């Protein structure tokens, strides 16, 4: 297959790896955080990213092999390090800055899955990316709810 193309599995792996890197980021920030509110937020986000990484791993295990091996002509960049470097946090971020970064990363995956779902040629591949899109949109809502609860404290 030409290098312009990617398999469905590569997109799922990208999501898993990005969630794993985000968990590491939140864990690292938590080690240096001083405010209890920030620590609580980072702990929540770390557990949440771990859950998302595990959810994508289960999704991959439970999916038919054929659909994961399907090729897509649409081929955006899937570089986890580039995605991580796209957003910058100060050394001691506030809870607002952390929430904004979390939502920005969610948007990265939401936009990717939405675009791939729109460009996919067959209905099964479209369905896979619509499911991934729903999973990420639910995550974004959970992060927003956690942020609201934190602000009310």
Outline where the language-model segments fall.
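Non-heme di-metal
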Residues: 1-153
């Amino acid at each position: 297959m030409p290098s312009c193309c990617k398999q469905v599995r590569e997109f799922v792996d990208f999501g898993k790896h990005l969630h794993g890197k985000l968990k590491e980021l939140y864990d690292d920030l938590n080690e240096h955080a001083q405010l209890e509110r920030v620590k609580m937020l980072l702990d929540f986000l770390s557990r949440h990213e771990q859950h998302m990484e595990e959810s994508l791993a289960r999704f991959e295990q439970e999916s038919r092999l054929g659909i994961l091996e399907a090729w897509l002509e649409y081929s955006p960049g899937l570089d986890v390090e580039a995605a991580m470097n796209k957003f910058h946090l100060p050394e001691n971020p506030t809870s607002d800055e952390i929430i904004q970064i979390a939502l920005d990363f969610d948007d990265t995956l939401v936009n990717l899955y939405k675009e791939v779902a729109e460009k996919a040629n067959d209905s099964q591949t479209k369905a896979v990316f619509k499911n991934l899109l729903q999973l990420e949109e639910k995550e974004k809502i959970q992060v927003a709810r956690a942020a609201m609860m934190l602000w009310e404290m």
